[in-house]
Amino acid sequence: ITDLDRYLFGKYRGKKIIDINTPLNYKSFVFSNTIIKRNILDDAGTFDENMSNYGGEDTEISIRISKKYSQGIRKLITAEAYHITQKTINQYIENMFEYGKYNFYKIIDKHPSYKNDLGYLWINSIKGNMLFNTFSRFMCKTLMKLSHHPLLIKFLVIDAFIRGAKNKF
């Protein structure tokens, strides 16, 4: 297991233990390990092909599925999934920059009521600028030389997303 795997599938990214009878909300979908019935995709639609850059296509389809099946999407106890991450931490961080730059606003345009829930308020807010800036990024990268703690990775991932969103198009 890599440091990136520990971040992606650990508690600091928001890993939740979900009861079998609890409906999944759109934030709980991780499409690299998800099985969706064909009739649900036929009804909600497939991935948005206008999202040609990295990221957000899974979030966008999750929103559509959650809107149509708010009580119907459940965890399948018998399904087993194994996921091997092929990326480095730096590659993933670069992917999140690309997501913020190219696809985040496409999701917001299609689903404006979700913008605050998706982190829009952090992009140009005072609190976002105070927390995510050149100095804090430098400090975090310096600390990463000592430890690849998942919270440091999380900070750099969010920072990359915000920088990408500020540099859209």
Q: What would you call each of these model-derived segments?
A:
Residues 65-66:
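Hydrophobic residues within well-ordered alpha-helices
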